[in-house]
Amino acid sequence: MNKTIANAKRLYRLKLNQTLPEYKRFLYNEVLHDKSQILGIYGSRGVGKSTMLLQILNEMDYKITQKLYISCDHPMFQDLSLFEFVDAFSQKGGEVIVIDEIHEAKNFQKEIKLIYDFLNIKVM
């Protein structure tokens, strides 16, 4: 699992190197200041959900080692237990994780419920 977390962090750093637009979506401040442990955002393709979440993750007051972005449509996450991955990240000091394309993950509803029930980490 350590190798998977290291690879996910590397991919996140690559994502951070991409230029994000300065424009903020109308939900930006509401999502940024939301205190819920689990926050889901859904909508049509191409409307800016992923971009907004990356902008928010960048602005959150956590060290880079405490936050992570993953996309479940990446082959690395195909057969991975989200609960086990998030648990391992949390044990390494993770405080917040953005899980994009979560519908691509196996049993994602059950995995999110387990994260909510047992882990102390913010998931968007």
Task: Describe the role of every protein-language-model region.
Residues 1-124:
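Phosphate-binding site recognition
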